[in-house]
Amino acid sequence: MTSVCFTGHRKIDSPDMYALKSLLDSTICGLVKRGVTDFYCGGALGFDTMCAHMVLYLRKRKALDIKLHLVLPCSNEEQTKNWSYNDKQEFYAIMMAADSIEYIGSEYTKDCMKQRNARLIELADCCVAYYDQSNSRSGTGPVSYTHLRAHETSQ
């Protein structure tokens, strides 16, 4: 196993933030010890952003030989069209630090997020997911879809 993707909710409650970051740190470090070198993020707000930051942080602070790859659903302008100024700046900083960027398409379509998720699963040997049972749907459909695709791919 050498590659992992991330998926999860866009909204993370503040009380969960510290514990989630700590768990993410130990999860990524554990995966690196098992041979994972490539981490794939979908570039969405919330968990994707947190994961991208953590990969970059661990690469720099702990001198880990790991790579961050972004798989984006559409062009930067389309994806960030309704984002706040601060969210856009954070996104562009992550893009500048990423090792590679792949675009599913140039324009936003009704299926581009699902196509992005399918591509993430296709590229990864394993998927790390953040699931909040009080929020069982995401902007891209049922969370179970990505879980199901990951399970099917692993068999």
Each language-model region and where it sits:
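Conserved small/polar residues in nucleotide/adenosyl-binding loops
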Residues: 146-153
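An anion/phosphate-binding loop that grips the pyrophosphate of nucleotide cofactors and donors
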Residues: 124
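Structural beta-alpha unit
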Residues: 111-113, 120
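C-terminal binding/interaction regions
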Residues: 115, 142
